[in-house]
């Protein structure tokens, strides 16, 4: 009986899996702790193993990163001093919001290009936890240095990170500690330090907030003049203070060491340990992590003097982490960055406002998730519900379509040609889908994905595809976009 056209022969031998395919466990670890797989990253993991890759990533100084470091010089104003930035704004040479847009671009492009993927992921996590919106009044003068300070401590001790962010001029400007005085302590930072950054709601009193604010007085910024940061002993409120089990006579007008001891106490508080553990578990495991896992991670955190690396090691070793594949939705910025990486798109130094390294910010904006722009001090959500709406998905599909076709952005950027995706002169459509899945999603194509690709293109599994086929001539964007629209790409 003649075989129906387009049907795959039953005895057809399937090709061997590509060397670019990772095991499920490897892919799970690497996608959770990166901004998406690339050919080079996958080959590195296959050569050394995912565990060895992760171990090296936890010591970013050991990871050569010329592509990521090159980005540092692409936007010169990010290296200017606070006074210079302020004067340029006042003279209408360069407004602060433009500098902040460049800061967002640098972060996004770093995530695309950097080989230090775990460092970039952890930097974003802490920059969101200790959120200072880039649009807040005056923070542009110190916001770049604030992000850099977090990045340099993202894999260190939480106690060191906490002291750094609480005393940083950017945080002081945002939450008004920069103008807090002994006679009129401002409670904003004192409250958020307890509620958002450490122990959490419901565990502290208004008296705790008042003393927290008094402890933090003295850390000043000359706002709207030079924006110079300093410590002012005459503005420090002295006298006994008690907060969450921390007590001090607070006799000295120089409260800097007091601040250090106070933040160190909060960093080591059991409630803080559980909040840090839960945040890591929500980010890297699932939206509602088991309490047993949170408690385990909190113990590791305290046993290692608030060091983050041992907590991450314990997290990835847990059975709960291993069983959590495919449970986290990529947020808008993660989706944009992962799409650049999956398609092998090469960004170059921006020459104009239309350059891809500039336009990448508008891409995240179009999906409703530009970096560092959440309006409240609690930081952007890291749970699925916030990013899984129909509107967001439709916006992502549009972005995937534009990039699959290489239509936008199109300046100072390189896309692969449609023909370059073909594995040979002639290939069955189902084998082409497999080939693309292995090079874009780095996994074999599922039956559901093949069905979706057939529906999107109107082709049958057995259709022969050549370089002159209409799919290659004009239909490849639809096929590539179908892969990018799949759950395999939309989750991490």
Model-found features: residue ranges?
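Hydrophobic/aromatic residues in well-formed alpha-helices
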Residues: 42, 50-53, 209, 432, ...
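N-terminal accessory alpha/beta regions
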Residues: 3, 39-153
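Active-site substrate-binding loop specific to GH73 endo-beta-N-acetylglucosaminidase modules
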Residues: 2-15, 85-87, 103-104, 139-355, ...
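Alpha-helix C-capping/helix-to-loop hinge sites
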Residues: 33, 110-111, 129-133, 196, ...
